[in-house]
C-alpha cells in the first residue's frame, strides 16, 4: 500500500472514530477527534510541497475540514439548534474514504476552512466582544488565520553568582468546562506595575490531557530574568487561551497572576480571574466561586 493510501485510510479511521463517539453521546471525545482530523486535512491542503493530491482534491479536503469544524461548533453550542447534524456529516464518509477517486460535487455549500490567525495580546478580547455583538445579526467578516506553533518556551538563563532563577511548573488548571476547551494553552508573561513586559512572552504547548474539571499541562516555564533584577511591584501573569471554532480565533478565557512575595519553593495554587486580562491589577473579578485554581510548582536556582 502506498503512503498516500495509508494516509487516506488513517483519515477515514479517524473520521469513523469521531462519528462513533458522536453517536454514542461522547461529545468531548468526538470534538477532539474532529479537531485532530480537521488539523491534519488543513495541513495537507496548505502544504506547498505535497503532490499527493490534485488542487481539486485539496479543495475538497478543505471543505471537509470546514464541515468537521462546523460539527465541532454545533456540539459546543448547547443554547441553540445544531447547525450541522451528525447525519449530515456521515454523508461525507464516501468522500474521505475515496478522496483519490472522488469526482462528484461536494454535497454542501461550504468554503475551505481559512488559515488561523494568532491575535496580538488584548486583540482577542476586542474581537470576542465584536463577534458576540455580531452573532445575533450575522454582521462582521471572517478574518484570515495563520497556524499557531506548538509553544514558544525558552531555555533557562545562564546562572550568575548570587543571583536566583525561577522555574515554574504549570501542573494543571481547574475549569468547570475543562473538557470543552479546544487546543488549550497558557501564555506566561512578566509585567511591571504599568503592565509593561519585562521579559519575552512565552506560550506553553497545547495541553495533552483533560480529566474531569482539570486540564493538565505538566510543563516547565523558565522565567527569563534573575529575580533580583525584577522591579518592585512586578508580577507573573498566566493567560489561559483556547480556540473557538465557531468564531475561528483563539480567545483568552481567564487569567491568573503571582506577585513577588508569593515566590517561594514548592507548590502554590492561585486564583483565576475573568477576562479581559488586567495587567495593572486594578479591576479584578474572580472567574468563579468554586474551588478551581491554577496549580503551579516553583523551583528556585541559586549559585
UniProtKB/Swiss-Prot annotation:
Residues 133-156 are annotated as: Disordered. Disulfide bonds: none annotated. InterPro entries: Aida_C (IPR025939), AIDA_N (IPR023421), AIDA_N_sf (IPR036818), C2_domain_sf (IPR035892). Residues 154-301 form the C2 Aida-type domain. GO terms for cellular component: membrane. Residues 151-218 are annotated as: Axin-binding. Transmembrane segments: none annotated. PROSITE patterns: C2_AIDA. Residues 25-51 form a coiled coil. GO terms for biological process: determination of ventral identity; dorsal/ventral pattern formation; negative regulation of determination of dorsal identity; negative regulation of JNK cascade; negative regulation of JUN kinase activity; negative regulation of protein-containing complex assembly. Keywords: Coiled coil, Developmental protein. One of its GO terms (molecular function) is phosphatidylinositol binding. Residues 147-156 have a biased composition (Low complexity). At 24 hours post-fertilization, expressed in most tissues, with strongest expression in the brain and somites. Belongs to the AIDA family. Acts as a ventralizing factor during embryogenesis. Inhibits axin-mediated JNK activation by binding axin and disrupting axin homodimerization. This in turn antagonizes a Wnt/beta-catenin-independent dorsalization pathway activated by axin/JNK-signaling. This is Axin interactor, dorsalization-associated protein. The lineage of its organism: Eukaryota, Metazoa, Chordata, Craniata, Vertebrata.
Amino acid at each position: 500500500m502506498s503512503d498516500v493510501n495509508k494516509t487516506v485510510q488513517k483519515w477515514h479511521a479517524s473520521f469513523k472514530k469521531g462519528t462513533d463517539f458522536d453517536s454514542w453521546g461522547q461529545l468531548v471525545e468526538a470534538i477532539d477527534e474532529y479537531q485532530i482530523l480537521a488539523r491534519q486535512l488543513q495541513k495537507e491542503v496548505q502544504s506547498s510541497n505535497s503532490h499527493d493530491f490534485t488542487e481539486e482534491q485539496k479543495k475538497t479536503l478543505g471543505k471537509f475540514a470546514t464541515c468537521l469544524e462546523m460539527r465541532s461548533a454545533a456540539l459546543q453550542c448547547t443554547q441553540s439548534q445544531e447547525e450541522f447534524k451528525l447525519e449530515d456529516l456521515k454523508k461525507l464518509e464516501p468522500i474521505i474514504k475515496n478522496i483519490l477517486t472522488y469526482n462528484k460535487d461536494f454535497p454542501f455549500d461550504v468554503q475551505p476552512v481559512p488559515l488561523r490567525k494568532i491575535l496580538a495580546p488584548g486583540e482577542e478580547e476586542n474581537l470576542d466582544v465584536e463577534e458576540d455583538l455580531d452573532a445575533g445579526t450575522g454582521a462582521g467578516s471572517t478574518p484570515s488565520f495563520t497556524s499557531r506553533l506548538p509553544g514558544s518556551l525558552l531555555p533557562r538563563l545562564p546562572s550568575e553568582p548570587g543571583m536566583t532563577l525561577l522555574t515554574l511548573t504549570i501542573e494543571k488548571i481547574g475549569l468547570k468546562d475543562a473538557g470543552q476547551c479546544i487546543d488549550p494553552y497558557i501564555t506566561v508573561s512578566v509585567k511591571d506595575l504599568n503592565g509593561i513586559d519585562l521579559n519575552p512572552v512565552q506560550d506553553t504547548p497545547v495541553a495533552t490531557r483533560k480529566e474531569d474539571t482539570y486540564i493538565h499541562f505538566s510543563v516547565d516555564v523558565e522565567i527569563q530574568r534573575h529575580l533580583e533584577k525584577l522591579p518592585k511591584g512586578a508580577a507573573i501573569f498566566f493567560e489561559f487561551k483556547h480556540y473557538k471554532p465557531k468564531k475561528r480565533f483563539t480567545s483568552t478565557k481567564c487569567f491568573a497572576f503571582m506577585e513577588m512575595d508569593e515566590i517561594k519553593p514548592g507548590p502554590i495554587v492561585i486564583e483565576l480571574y475573568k477576562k479581559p486580562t488586567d495587567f495593572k491589577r486594578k479591576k479584578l473579578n474572580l472567574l468563579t466561586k468554586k474551588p478551581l485554581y491554577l496549580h503551579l510548582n516553583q523551583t528556585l536556582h541559586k549559585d
